[in-house]
């Protein structure tokens, strides 16, 4: 672990920059690794290409460490939005979501409903726009199968209590857009079933560093819809046949990052 002094010195952006909730300027470590990878990929050597490809597993392990899970349950995604859509397009039944959430959540719910007709958006109306355990409890119905929520509200900074929401919704699916707080706030991610986020804000890792974690319950209940060549259990590139979809989190991926 680096010292607090070394960590402080890694912030090289202009003095006064405070907009990490929108974009975190890339850290020196990220820039150095990116440059090194570009040089390795520029040589054409197989060893350099394979070295860069191994970073996929490392990234999954690091995300898993922050969530408190295993890397096998973590998928890398192009963005938070794609991770959320992988989850919501796989839901069947009424999914509770506030129309006041960041547009990613209500948009994904509505698009999934329009395209597949198996998810029904259950719009959660609140007086202050905050998704509290009390508001969710009052709105729950026997038809509710999932709740989609932001970890941190992007307008107010309200922090959602995932543990309390889990107590309220029981064994229903809890799908969390964590991008606004991942890496900066403590949260009980194990209370959730899907956690989607990105490294371009508080982790200072740049865009394209998205991920989605799936619990065992999520893997049992979600239907992989947007599943590509990496969504199978076949090692390497399948040829001359179409393999079945994986039963692991890989099912919710399309291609290698």
Regions found by a protein language model. Give the residues of each.
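Pyridoxal 5′-phosphate
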Residues: 1-257
């Amino acid at each position: 672990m680096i010292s607090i002094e070394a960590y402080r010195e890694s912030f090289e952006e202009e003095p006064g920059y405070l907009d990490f909730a929108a974009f975190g300027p890339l850290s020196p470590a990220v820039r150095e690794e990116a440059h090194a990878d570009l040089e390795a990929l520029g040589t054409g050597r197989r060893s350099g290409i394979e070295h860069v490809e191994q970073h996929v597993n490392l990234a999954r392990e690091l995300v898993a460490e922050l969530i408190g899970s295993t890397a096998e349950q973590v998928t890398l995604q192009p963005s938070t939005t794609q991770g959320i859509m992988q989850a919501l397009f796989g839901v069947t039944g009424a999914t509770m979501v506030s129309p006041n959430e960041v547009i990613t959540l209500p948009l994904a719910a509505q698009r999934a409903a329009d395209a597949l007709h198996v998810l029904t958006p259950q719009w959660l109306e609140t007086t202050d726009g905050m998704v509290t355990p009390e508001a969710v409890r009052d709105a729950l119905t026997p038809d509710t199968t999932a709740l989609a929520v932001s970890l941190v509200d992007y307008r107010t900074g309200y922090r959602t209590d995932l543990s309390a929401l889990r107590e309220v919704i029981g064994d229903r699916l809890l799908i969390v857009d964590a991008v606004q707080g991942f890496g900066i706030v403590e949260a009980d991610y194990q209370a959730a079933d899907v956690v989607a986020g990105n490294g371009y804000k508080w982790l200072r890792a740049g865009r394209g560093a998205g991920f989605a974690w799936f619990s065992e319950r999520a893997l049992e209940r979600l239907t992989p819809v947007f599943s590509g060549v990496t969504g199978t259990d076949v090692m390497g590139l399948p040829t001359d046949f179409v393999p079945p979809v994986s039963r692991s989190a890989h099912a919710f991926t399309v291609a290698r990052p």
